Amino acid sequence: MRLSRLRRWFSVVCVAALSCVECMAAQPAAAQGAPGTAVRQFVRIAAPRVVLTHVRVIDGTGAPASDDRNVTIEGGRITSIRAAADASASDAAVTLDLRGYSVMPGIVGMHNHLFYLVRPNLNAQKKFDPPVLAPQMTFSAPRLYLGAGVTTMRTTGSVETYADLNLKRDIDAGKLPGPHMDVTGPYLEGAESFFLQMPHLASPEDARQLVEYWADHGVTSFKAYMNITRAELKAAIDAAHKRGLKVTGHLCSVTYKEAAELGIDDLEHGFFVNTQLDPGKKPDVCSESAGEYTLDHMPPESTEAKDLIDTLVKHHVAITSTLPVFEGDAGGGRPPLRQQALDAMTPEAREAFFILRQRSASSPAPKIDPAMLFKRNMELERAFVAAGGLLIAGPDPTGRGDVIPGFGDQREIELLVEAGFTPVEAIKIATLNGATYMGKEKQIGSIAAGKNADLIVMKGDPSKKISDIENVEIVFKDGVGFDSQKLLDSVKGRYGQY
């Protein structure tokens, strides 16, 4: 995905208070299978009782960090958080001295895919043969997500839904490593889709039947796509809501305001793809501008922006920020892709990324400044939060291949800080806010006694220096501590292959 000529990009490239707090909960953490052979090799800590001592706690609520705490984990849950001076860990099965380290909630990724985009026969002249395809990354993506600290993820659109459901089953059973998963069904896309691997809806009845079929098979959310009609979207929303399931959307044919009034629960990509002001926008048809014009002409102080944000907040519509997928086209001065991310890619994936990056750099200057649009979207996301809106976060690992699972989630948090949020606010958006949207805020998303022990241990202090969020060493999921580096090393050079 890119800022300039977003529609063309999709059609051609993407086709796409911390004193002593005792445990108040008697119920155990959600049952998970004991780690099997394929999982045990990545387990660094597995004990009935673990105490993280002298650690800095960033609790995910947006509150200031608390230094020198002891966090106790038992039975997959956090059982206490105490000032280290007031606590004794002598009877712990495992004690970790974490001076100089921070612990925060596991990331709740809300726009995380399990596929990768390929352009067949892409060559140095930047030409390729149609169609753009989305091969499944069932092996590499879950390890990358978990290794980077993503302990819960929403797939936010599936191209191999049975594979995603079976992957979730095997992760939950302890057979494979990976995060907790909210499996989104196949894309709810209209007849004009440029993706061969998406269903092409022909009627509202099609939409209803698709939702009901996949809800029966275990899907827990749905995503509408760019060419869906209002009638089809309404049918899908109604069918999902009858099952207690939510619908999000990366829209174009339907405007944000229309979708909110139809009852949608979430809108993807911040404010990049709202088309309500686009010239020549026809009902149920994606505009040529695909939202660029609207973003350019909707500063936060405008009547249109204030009215839209008011509508979204009144209808309890969340917004998913996906800044990394737009960053590559946001002008010069952007940091290069991290070496760890490049190392995760196959040689072919790296080559394709470099070709596509060069094509972007050598393309004629767009009429609308991409850097301005990137900044404008950040301003609108801040205005949405200031108005009481629920902002959640994810990376969208698609585009030209430079948004990598897990690493992209970390980068999203860094970019939220660039957007003007404080580090602890950005961490809340990427943790507790996502849990709140999913209705799981009592189980995950923040560090509190009684909650699941889904935690990230990292060297440094991301509450002051957000880039320290990259220094992940241990990821706890349901109280089991995974070795981040081992997970990442296990898929080095494999992302883009499987």
Which residues are covered by each model-predicted region?
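Bacterial N-terminal signal peptides
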Residues: S11-C23
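Histidine-rich, glycine-flanked metal-binding segment
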Residues: A34-P48, V57, G62-M104
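Acidic, glycine-enriched loop/beta-strand segments at the rims
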Residues: V39-R44, V57-N70, A83-A84, I404, ...
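Histidine-centered divalent metal-coordination motifs
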Residues: H54, Y101, H111-F115, H250, ...
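Metal-associated gating/positioning segment near the N- to mid-region
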Residues: S102-A173, F194, E205, K257-G263
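Acidic/histidine-rich helix-loop elements
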Residues: L114-A134, L188-P204, Q276-K281, C286-H297, ...
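Divalent metal-dependent hydrolysis catalytic cores, especially in the metallo-beta-lactamase
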Residues: T138-Y162, P179-P186, D216-I228, K246-T248, ...
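Active-site neighborhoods of metal-dependent hydrolases
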Residues: L210-A224, I228, V273-A419, R494-Y498
